[in-house]
Amino acid sequence: MYINTILFDLDGTLIDTAPDLSYALNTLLEEAGLEAKSFEKIKPLVAFGGKALIKFGFNYDEEHPEFFKRHQELLEIYTNNIDLNSKPFEGVIALIKILKDRQINWGIVTNKPEYLTHLLLQKLNINVDVVVCGDTLEFS
């Protein structure tokens, strides 16, 4: 069987974004006068997106009157610090080169918003054949 395309998740698979997402959440918590959370507790949640981080950090559900505002603030902090410590996992750049050399298309399917995905890939100088994000399609 010949494989001509491979799709990957982004956060926690290709790119270690946990440090910058953790930084964004803890910055927001500290600005709100709350105690920062440990990286070890935040790290498993990053794959579930910013809303999961707000639920964890503030103990809010999505019906809380400040949930949307806090989520937007988190995204703003993250946007401004998206490449502070995020980096490809070991071997990812070599893997991308192998795929290109073998003329295998590759892409990303992620729950991360499109504007953040493209910004992160640009900052890390990663060129990809196709990207499908959490807000790319009508249903995610």
Listing of model-derived features with the role each one plays in the protein:
Residues 25, 95-122, 134:
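Substrate-recognition element of Asp-dependent hydrolases with the DxDx(T/V) motif
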Residues 5-7, 107, 130:
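Hydrophobic "anchor" residues on beta-strands that sit immediately upstream
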Residues 2-93, 102, 113-115:
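N-terminal helical cap/lid subdomain that shapes the substrate entry/recognition surface
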Residues 84-87, 113-140:
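Substrate-recognition "cap/lid" segment bordering the active-site pocket of phosphatases
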